[in-house]
A protein has these predicted regions:
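Bacterial N-terminal signal peptides that target proteins for export
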Residues: 2-12, 20
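C-terminal segment of classical bacterial N-terminal signal peptides
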Residues: 17-27
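Acidic, small-residue rich beta-repeat scaffolds with periodic aromatic anchors
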Residues: 29-57, 71-74, 143-207
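Residue-level detector of Asp-centered blade-edge/turn motifs that repeat once per structural unit
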Residues: 60, 118-119
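Structural motif
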Residues: 76-85, 131-141, 184-195
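Short glycine-/Asp-/Thr-/Trp-enriched loop segments that recur within the blades
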Residues: 103-109, 159-164
Length: 207
C-alpha cells in the first residue's frame, strides 16, 4: 500500500471516530430535570441546573418582592426540592428571610403555592415536605409587612394543621384555608377563615 493510500485510510478512520463520538445515544442527550419537586433515581451532575431562577412575587402595590429560591441540597432531587423565602424591598434591600432546607435534603420543605394579600400587607405560602413525610399536611407561613416577621399560620388557628396547599383571600387580608373538623379526621376537611391583621396582633412577641 502506497503512502498516499495509507494517509487517506488514516483520515477516513479519524473521521469515522469523530462521527461516532459526536452521535451520542438519545438517552444521554436528554436534559437534566431541574424543576418540579422531583426525586431522581440517580444523581444529576453537580454543575447542573445553575441557570434555575427564583420565583418572584411582587406585592400588588409594587413596594415589596417575595422570592422563592431553590436551595439545591441533594443531587438525587431537583434543586427546588427545598426552598428559601426572601422578602425584599423594590430597591433590593432584604427585609427578612427564612430557610426550609435540611442537612441532606430530605427533611425540609418546598413552597407549593404563594400569594400576596390584596392590600399588600401579608405574603402567604404553603409548603410540602421534601421527604414526603406527613403527605396530608401542607404547613403555611405568613409574612407580616408591619411586623417584618414570618409566622406559622397554624399558630393562628389553635395549632391545627392545614390539609391543602390551596388557599385564597376573601377581602383585603382575610385568608381562607382548610383544616380538619376534628383532630385526626384527615378526610373531613373544613374551611377556616382568619383575619390576618387580627391574628398577627394576638401572637406573642418574637425573640
Amino acid at each position: 500500500m502506497g503512502l498516499d493510500m495509507r494517509f487517506a485510510l488514516v483520515i477516513c478512520l479519524a473521521i469515522a471516530g469523530l462521527s461516532s463520538a459526536t452521535l451520542v445515544p438519545a438517552p444521554a442527550l436528554a436534559e437534566v430535570v431541574c424543576s418540579g419537586h422531583k426525586l431522581l433515581s440517580s444523581p444529576r451532575p453537580e454543575s447542573s441546573c445553575s441557570s434555575l431562577k427564583p420565583r418572584i412575587y411582587p406585592s400588588p402595590d409594587g413596594a415589596l418582592r417575595a422570592l422563592v429560591l431553590p436551595v439545591d441540597v441533594s443531587l438525587y432531587a431537583t434543586p427546588d426540592m427545598e426552598s428559601r423565602v426572601v422578602i425584599r424591598t423594590s430597591n433590593g434591600d432584604t427585609v427578612t428571610s427564612k430557610d426550609y432546607l435540611s442537612p441532606r435534603g430530605t427533611n425540609g420543605y418546598y413552597v407549593v403555592n404563594a400569594k400576596w394579600s390584596p392590600d399588600s400587607q401579608f405574603f402567604l405560602y404553603s409548603m410540602a415536605s421534601s421527604g414526603g413525610h406527613s403527605p396530608w399536611s401542607f404547613p403555611m407561613m405568613v409574612y407580616s409587612r408591619e411586623k417584618k416577621r414570618i409566622a406559622p399560620f397554624s399558630d393562628m388557628i389553635d395549632g391545627k394543621p392545614t390539609l391543602s396547599a390551596d388557599f385564597h383571600f376573601d377581602g383585603a387580608h382575610r385568608l381562607v384555608a382548610e383544616t380538619w373538623k376534628a383532630p385526626g379526621s384527615l378526610d373531613d376537611k373544613v374551611p377556616v377563615t382568619v383575619d390576618l391583621e387580627d391574628a398577627f396582633g394576638k401572637l406573642p412577641a418574637s425573640d
